[in-house]
Amino acid sequence: MTTNSRPSALQAPGLQIFSMLKSSEEDGFMSSSLTLDSDNIIGVTENNRQEFYSTWRKPSLLSSRSVLHEYSPTIVGSNDSTFSPITVGKTTKFFNWDDIISRIFMQQPFGVTHQFFEEFRYSIITSHFLNDMNHYRLSLHLDQSIMNFHKSSTLLKNVPPKSVPFMATKYGKLAVVEDKKLYFRQNFNYLSMIITSYRVLTQLKKYCRRKNSPGLKRVVILILVAVYLSIQQEYFRRHLICYKTLLKVRKVLESLQQVDVMIHKYHLRFKEIKNHSFISRVSLISIADEHSSVIKELLVFSSDALFYKLKSIIPDIVIFSDTSELSKYCELYGIDVPNLYYNNTTTVKDLDGKLYRLKLLKKFMLCCLLSLDMAGNENLSNVNMRNALNKIFPDYMARVQLKKKYNPIGTFQNIVSLLRGLHSLLSTVLVSLNDHKQILYAFPEETSTNTGCERANVCSFSKNDKLFQALNYLKMIENNLLAIDIRNGITENDRNIIEDKLEELITFWKTSKICGNISRIQKVSPTNTINHGFHLDILKGRKSPRSSSVQGLSLERKVDFIDVAESVNDSFENDTELEEYEDYDCQEECSAGSRQNHRVDFIGKDNCRKPDFKQLSDNELRRKLDERILKLAQENREGRERLRTAKSFELLRKAQASMSVKFGFQKPLRDDAFLESRPLSKCKVSSEETIPFLYELKGLLGNDS
């Protein structure tokens, strides 16, 4: 045989099906093809010419060494241009047909879909939107997962790094274009090959009488090889599509979570800027209006873009969903269908409404993906849900009627094409939100340098105020103290840093001017500031009228005490009133003293200004809030105890008066009857717990008399 002669039609059973290249085709293979890379789904195209065909050489110009490689799983390794004839030995004359057939049909193409759909649903259910609390703890790790596709395939493990021409594999004709991007051509149609093989085997069984003839064995082996290749190619195609679908869904869910987190941060920042006047009297951001407008534009742009994108792709997804399952998932995850209809058909202008409808539509899209019809049960659909969907999406019924017959692989390909467009929009929105991230962490020093002109300041003091700068010095010292690692002790370097900061603060404070008159103090009347219950606005507190200013108390001044005679009843009532207001007066003096110190040290002026909560950390705010709540709770508890004690003594006095009236005792007789050793006003009653003893003693005295 010469070197330029073509090989024979059949050198070994079945080898010519996947080892020979047809030189008659000039532009490559033009049947159904698949392309695989890390970002794009495999596309199945028919009778189309790819632009990278021009880089391939003609099969007649290829050498056998450039086509056949050892990493190809189904090609017989050979460095010769032709295959030598194979002689069947006696050991292979009686081989086991059952073992061969079982190995051929071991990997069923349709079994991949069910395994994939379980992982598909699990990834969506454990996402950030449907399982907010525990999504980070419910990651799925399987030994046999769709995501292990690259690990399980010997061919994909050994992909050459550069472009190579066509290689024949059991998955189809393979070409590596660039950056390990694979192009597959599926040259066996699964269904047509199975049907044709079944018909041929039926005819052979009917007309072939010699069951052990060599020719019959060659034909059967040829048919089995064709069936095996068609099964492998269909299995590979379905497996690859499921893998790319799950990969794209996870990327979309991750991008949705990132965008949702950024939108939430911007929304919180927007609320802080808008409501800062209700939290504090001091505004730390001089360009708050400009920042609020930028944040609002970002939120409106992001919410509107994502909402209308979801509104355009959901009608294409919901036609593949089972309406019965969709209604169950909507009920499970709290999606109100009338509310969905309202937000999808009406125009929303406020920002909160835009964010709410976006969140609602994202959850509904995930419910549609969870309820994909994998069994083709169109007769078991929910009529009420279908009618509602027809109202929400006017062309829903028309799309359902135009939908092709049940084909899960085709459904996944359509879903992935829709999610690819959504993922590109999410990436754009995320980039835009990240570009303006500095607004989330804007401080007064940063915002003041960004503006060239001075703006009207809503603060009662300017940014150049000496007290404000001193507070910033203290804040830096506090941060340095918190940064010290106390486990290793305070080092000399840490000590020097703190001392330098303190010296700078002392120098600054000495050079600054003392402004304002701090000698005047004000005292709030306790009669006008009685706390009637628990006030909800803890940060703001209750407002009380200011009393006129008084002079400072002199401790050296002599105080004259006047003795006043009083009766028994009057003394008892006065003692009760003194006990009732004793604690409260003490608290008022303490609070007045603290307010006085606060005015002197913090402001240096007459008016009392509340501390700035924006300069405090989360732990400090939480600590101040807890202290305020505990203080108010203690005041309420003490007030209730004083009121209960006063009522109890009032009942005691009424019982004593009624007993004297009932028996008609005069003054001396009453004294003899009750055998009182001293007046009741002189009896020291420490608390309410002593009242039952008084009742019991009076009862005993009454029985003895």
UniProtKB/Swiss-Prot annotation:
UniProtKB keywords: Glycoprotein, Membrane, Peroxisome, Receptor, Transmembrane, Transmembrane helix
Similarity comment: Belongs to the INP2 family.
Name of the protein in question: Inheritance of peroxisomes protein 2
Record: glycosylation sites: N79, N275, N343, N344, N379, N517, N569, N574
InterPro entries: INP2
Topology term for the membrane: Single-pass membrane protein
GO biological process assignments: peroxisome inheritance
Tree of life domain: Eukaryota
Binding partners and assembly: Interacts with MYO2.
Role: Required for peroxisome inheritance. Acts as the peroxisome-specific receptor for the myosin V motor MYO2.
Transmembrane segments: 215-231
UniProt keyword Ribonucleoprotein, yes or no: no
Organism whose genome encodes this protein: Saccharomyces cerevisiae (strain YJM789)
Subcellular localization(s) per the UniProt record: Peroxisome membrane
Sections of the chain in a coiled coil: none
GO cellular component: peroxisomal membrane
